From Swiss-Prot:
Record-linked InterPro entries: Orthopox_F14
Induction context: Expressed in the early phase of the viral replicative cycle.
Keywords: Early protein
Protein family membership: Belongs to the orthopoxvirus OPG058 family.
Organism listed in the record: Vaccinia virus (strain L-IVP) (VACV)
One Pfam family named in its UniProt record: Orthopox_F14
Name of the featured protein: Protein OPG058
Amino acid sequence: MKYRLYSEGLSITNDLNSIIGQQSTMDTDIEIDEDDIMELLNILTELGCDVDFDENFSDIADDILESLIEQDV
C-alpha cells in the first residue's frame, strides 16, 4: 500500500524542490510505501527520535522534523 505524504510549509520544501527541479515551493507530495515508512521509523528510533503518526501516516513528515529538531540531530 502506498501513502501520500504532504510537506506543506516545511522548511525543507525549497531545497527539495530545487533538487527535483519543480517550480512550486509551496508543497510537495511524496509517494512512499509502508515498508519504507517502517524502515525509516526504525532508523529514527535508533537515533533516539520519538515519532508519532496517525494510521494513515499523513502527518509523519512534520512529526519526523519536529522529533529531529528536539533531538538536535
